A protein has these predicted regions:
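Hydrophobic, aromatic-enriched alpha-helical segments typical of multi-pass transmembrane helices
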Residues: 7-274
Length: 274
């Protein structure tokens, strides 16, 4: 998927030399405020998006390893718990909260020119996704406490039930956060904002507009009991959304937002060169 998107990324290579040559000149609007640097904003956004992958995937793997569980069957297994893996995963998950909130905040001043309502909606979606991530962190830390109590000679039956409850809470927080809210926020809302604004190639943004609803459909099927989260169909239906987010992060980190975007031109239209 990433290889197939490389021609899109190269579309606006022409003219980049001129952009770099003029980069030393600062744009000042009629109000005296500096004009938004769309390329720089896009690159920050891209690196933050890559940061969500760098933190979320290892955190998930560490949680599964720390619980002694599997991707589709997350539960508390007494004797197989690794506190070190769970604690390190919790730290990475907190990093995920920081990076995903950053992706929404860093572009707000720019994309609100396209639609302030949708820009605020994206911030709200990222905040809600972060809330589910925080619930997951608390659940995992609680599992560590249960494992410690079990090692100290506590009631094995009662503590196993408690540990399974916390593990189940984490799994459902994961399902509602990355499994549903991400499809709404990153897929539908962000995909539409990128498509309408032209900050990235429209063909790339279309992947988000397709991947978001597909991920939402997968969430509904899991709720209906069609399959478990992490099983074959779940992974397949997650691919379009994951491909959209990863390609968006790589493209923006590499090239930034397109300066010929209509909202970028709106920002710079009253500007004068110094």
């Amino acid at each position: 998927l990433i290889i197939s998107l490389l021609p899109i990324a190269l579309e606006d290579t022409t003219g980049m030399t001129a952009q770099r040559q003029s980069g030393s000149r600062r744009e000042i609007s009629d109000t005296g405020d500096p004009v938004v640097d769309v390329r720089r904003t896009g690159r920050i956004f891209g690196w933050l998006f890559i940061g969500t992958f760098v933190t979320s995937i290892p955190a998930r793997l560490l949680f599964i390893h720390g619980l002694g569980a599997t991707w589709s069957d997350v539960r508390f297994l007494p004797g197989d718990t690794s506190s070190a893996s769970l604690k390190f995963g919790a730290v990475l998950e907190f990093g995920l909260i920081v990076t995903q909130l950053g992706t929404a905040l860093v572009i707000h001043s720019l994309v609100k020119r396209q639609s302030e309502t949708l820009s605020l909606s994206y911030i709200a979606a990222r905040t809600m996704e972060s809330v589910f991530a925080a619930i997951g962190i608390i659940s995992i830390i609680s599992v560590i406490n249960v494992a410690d109590a079990l090692s100290a000679g506590g009631d094995a039956t009662a503590l196993t039930v408690t540990g399974n409850s916390h593990a189940s809470m984490y799994q459902w927080a994961f399902q509602w956060g990355p499994g549903l809210v991400a499809g709404i926020g990153n897929g539908v809302i962000l995909g539409y904002l990128m498509y309408r604004s032209g900050l990235v190639p429209k063909r790339m943004a279309m992947i988000g507009l397709i991947g978001g609803p597909v991920l939402i459909l997968s969430h509904v099927l899991i709720l209906c009991g069609a399959y478990k989260n992490g099983e074959g169909p779940s992974g397949l239906l997650t691919l379009p959304e994951a491909g959209w987010e990863l390609s968006l992060g790589i493209y923006c980190a590499w090239k930034g937002f397109r300066p010929d975007s209509p909202i970028a031109r709106t920002t710079a239209s009253p500007a004068t060169r110094l």
